[in-house]
């Protein structure tokens, strides 16, 4: 007897995780090949703009708004052809409060996840596995200063206890994971909750929480304003400059999602799993290397930022106030190089400022993933450069020829 064909559904397909999942699912080889890959998005997107291939197995479904009620989302899912044949669901959607408020963002994401899983239960009757993407916020990293003794330093392990209220109310992944587990138990699905820290990669849209896209825009525009060979000081704090962290490239992350989902039938429910590229690094180590991609010279935080209580300070050539002074050049920049409009003018300064000032070590323990047999590793600088290659191809930043 032949086993039932594997069919994938990616919820949140145009984000930094979903975009790569599409490509990796199409590339997965036998015996874990997927006969179809259905991508769900809220806003319309073309295959060419997304840099997705023309492939008979690939289908894009737009207008799926997870912010609606469960009943409305179920109705939207019913309109997806062959939804009842889906076997593997990859939930990588992520909502964001317009003000970056943690509590409001948590509320949005919990509602989205519930609506999506209610729809899966109702119409995707052949589902075997739910691969949900969480993140390192479960370890309370953004709240470390306020948690005091309740914050447990890393390396962060999946066995660590949840942070207490009121901070737990700001971590949507707790309630999302609980709902995933409850629905999986109810429907005899296996499930995994994948926990990366920062994801390095490309997205065809100007995501407000994609570090490599935001940095790529900043670096490219900085090069345009100040010229080739300009010195670019790290715009974060001295403590953030030296803090250790782990990241993961979007392709490796996608392959880990696929690996855990296709091995669950034989290995059982994986549950929560940390993942990184296996390399512990710091801005001190990689900043000079990554800015070289743009022919810039990377330098430490400026001296005034390394003295006294200056952790929250910003570089004079970074942030919304600096950008306001050079805004006129942004339009010139896009026009001169024929770039997609409104990317540079919408750099996520608040998100960048937050990430570039995280002063605690945030290293993930990935032994559980290794024990499952996922042994991939990659280089952090190469992951950044790959994402910027995609941005050049998408005309979000100038090509090599234009930059010379």
UniProtKB/Swiss-Prot annotation:
<dbReference type="Pfam" id="PF22917">
    <property type="entry name" value="PRISE"/>
</dbReference>
<keyword id="KW-0521">NADP</keyword>
<feature type="binding site">
    <location>
        <position position="56"/>
    </location>
    <ligand>
        <name>NADP(+)</name>
    </ligand>
</feature>
<feature type="glycosylation site" description="N-linked (GlcNAc...) asparagine">
    <location>
        <position position="67"/>
    </location>
</feature>
<comment type="function">
    <text>Short chain dehydrogenase; part of the gene cluster that mediates the biosynthesis of sirodesmin PL, an epipolythiodioxopiperazine (ETP) characterized by a disulfide bridged cyclic dipeptide and that acts as a phytotoxin which is involved in the blackleg didease of canola. SirD catalyzes the O-prenylation of L-tyrosine (L-Tyr) in the presence of dimethylallyl diphosphate (DMAPP) to yield 4-O-dimethylallyl-L-Tyr, and therefore represents probably the first pathway-specific enzyme in the biosynthesis of sirodesmin PL.</text>
</comment>
<feature type="active site" description="Proton donor">
    <location>
        <position position="237"/>
    </location>
</feature>
<comment type="similarity">
    <text>Belongs to the short-chain dehydrogenases/reductases (SDR) family. Highly divergent.</text>
</comment>
<dbReference type="InterPro" id="IPR055222">
    <property type="entry name" value="PRISE-like_Rossmann-fold"/>
</dbReference>
<keyword id="KW-0732">Signal</keyword>
<feature type="signal peptide">
    <location>
        <begin position="1"/>
        <end position="28"/>
    </location>
</feature>
<dbReference type="InterPro" id="IPR036291">
    <property type="entry name" value="NAD(P)-bd_dom_sf"/>
</dbReference>
<comment type="pathway">
    <text>Mycotoxin biosynthesis.</text>
</comment>
<feature type="glycosylation site" description="N-linked (GlcNAc...) asparagine">
    <location>
        <position position="274"/>
    </location>
</feature>
<keyword id="KW-0325">Glycoprotein</keyword>
<keyword id="KW-0843">Virulence</keyword>
<keyword id="KW-0560">Oxidoreductase</keyword>
<feature type="glycosylation site" description="N-linked (GlcNAc...) asparagine">
    <location>
        <position position="157"/>
    </location>
</feature>
<feature type="binding site">
    <location>
        <position position="291"/>
    </location>
    <ligand>
        <name>NADP(+)</name>
    </ligand>
</feature>
<feature type="binding site">
    <location>
        <position position="58"/>
    </location>
    <ligand>
        <name>NADP(+)</name>
    </ligand>
</feature>
<dbReference type="GO" id="GO:0016491">
    <property type="term" value="F:oxidoreductase activity"/>
</dbReference>
<protein>
    <recommendedName>
        <fullName>Short chain dehydrogenase sirR</fullName>
        <ecNumber>1.-.-.-</ecNumber>
    </recommendedName>
</protein>
């Amino acid at each position: 007897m032949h086993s039932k064909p594997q069919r994938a559904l990616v919820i949140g397909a145009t984000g930094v995780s979903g975009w790569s999942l599409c490509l990796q699912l199409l590339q997965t080889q036998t015996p874990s090949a997927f006969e179809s890959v259905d991508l769900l998005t809220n806003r319309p997107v073309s295959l060419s703009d997304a840099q997705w291939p023309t492939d008979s197995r690939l289908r894009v479904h737009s207008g799926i708004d997870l912010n609606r009620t469960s009943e409305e989302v179920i109705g939207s899912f019913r309109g997806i052809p062959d939804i009842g044949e889906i076997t593997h669901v990859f939930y990588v959607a992520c909502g964001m409060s317009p003000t970056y408020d943690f509590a409001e963002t948590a509320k949005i994401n919990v509602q989205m996840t519930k609506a999506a899983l209610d729809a899966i239960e109702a119409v995707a009757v052949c589902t075997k596995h739910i691969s949900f993407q969480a993140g390192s916020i479960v370890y309370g990293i953004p709240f470390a200063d306020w948690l005091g003794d309740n914050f447990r330093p890393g390396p962060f392990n999946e066995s660590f206890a949840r942070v207490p209220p009121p901070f737990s109310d700001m971590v949507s992944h707790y309630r999302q994971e609980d709902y995933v587990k409850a629905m999986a138990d109810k429907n005899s699905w296996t499930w995994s909750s994948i926990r990366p820290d920062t994801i390095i990669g490309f997205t065809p849209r100007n995501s407000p929480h994609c570090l490599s896209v935001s940095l790529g825009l900043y670096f490219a525009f900085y090069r345009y304003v100040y010229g080739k060979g300009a010195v670019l000081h790290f715009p974060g704090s001295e403590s953030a400059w030296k803090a250790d962290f782990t990241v993961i490239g979007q392709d490796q992350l996608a392959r880990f999602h696929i690996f855990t989902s296709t091995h669950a039938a034989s290995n059982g429910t994986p549950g929560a799993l940390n993942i990184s590229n296996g390399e512990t690094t710091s801005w001190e180590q990689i900043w000079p290397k990554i800015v070289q991609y743009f022919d810039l010279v990377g330098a430490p935080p400026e001296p005034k930022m390394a003295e006294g209580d200056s952790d929250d300070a910003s570089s004079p050539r970074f942030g919304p106030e600096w950008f306001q002074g050079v805004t006129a050049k942004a339009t010139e920049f896009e026009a001169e190089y024929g770039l997609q409009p409104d990317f540079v003018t919408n750099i996520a300064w608040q998100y960048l400022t937050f990430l570039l000032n995280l002063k605690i070590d945030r290293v993930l323990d990935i032994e559980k993933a290794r024990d499952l047999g996922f042994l991939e590793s990659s280089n952090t600088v190469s992951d950044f450069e790959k994402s910027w290659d995609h941005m050049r191809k998408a005309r979000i930043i100038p090509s090599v020829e234009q930059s010379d």
